[in-house]
Regions:
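Short, Lys/Arg-enriched C-terminal cap helix and immediately downstream tail that follows
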Residues: 77-79, 85-86, 101-102
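Short, hydrophobic-biased segments on the C-terminal half of alpha helices
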Residues: 70-71
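DNA-binding patch around the recognition helix
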Residues: 76, 80, 94-95
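N-terminal helix-turn-helix DNA-binding core of bacterial DNA-binding proteins
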Residues: 19-62, 84, 88-95
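N-terminal leader segment of winged-helix/HTH proteins
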Residues: 1-28, 76-78
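Short, Lys/Arg-rich amphipathic alpha-helical interaction segments
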Residues: 88-110
Length: 110
């Protein structure tokens, strides 16, 4: 089903909520991205910064593979990137995760 650009409510979800749910669901559907996101969340809770080098050390993936997966997580909003000196550090965006879970709950209640 195709939805027009204006904000339309479908089964109690707005178009932007539908876009959020589909984008985040697609991003987390890949097992590697789910594990990368969980790792970043865990390290951020411990007040640790996470860069690509850390992810390459923690996982058995090439740097290029991790970079591709991180682009998807950043694009959907689950991860924020902050450039500091020579490195790009990744931070879990818990606000987007909360909006996602709220939208999924709202959809499942209908």
């Amino acid at each position: 089903m195709r939805i027009r650009k204006k904000e339309v409510v479908i089964d109690s979800l707005t178009t932007s909520e539908v876009d959020l749910v589909t984008g985040v669901s697609d991003a987390l559907a890949h097992p590697a991205r789910l594990e990368l996101y969980r790792y970043i969340m865990t390290e951020n809770r411990r007040m640790n910064k996470v860069c690509t080098k850390d992810l390459v050390s923690a996982f058995d993936y090439a740097q290029a593979t991790i970079s591709q997966h991180m682009k998807v997580l950043v694009k959907c909003g689950l991860v924020d990137v902050k450039n500091e000196e020579k490195f790009a550090y990744y931070y879990a965006n818990l606000g987007v995760l909360m909006k996602y879970t709220d939208a999924v709950k709202k959809y499942s209640i209908v």
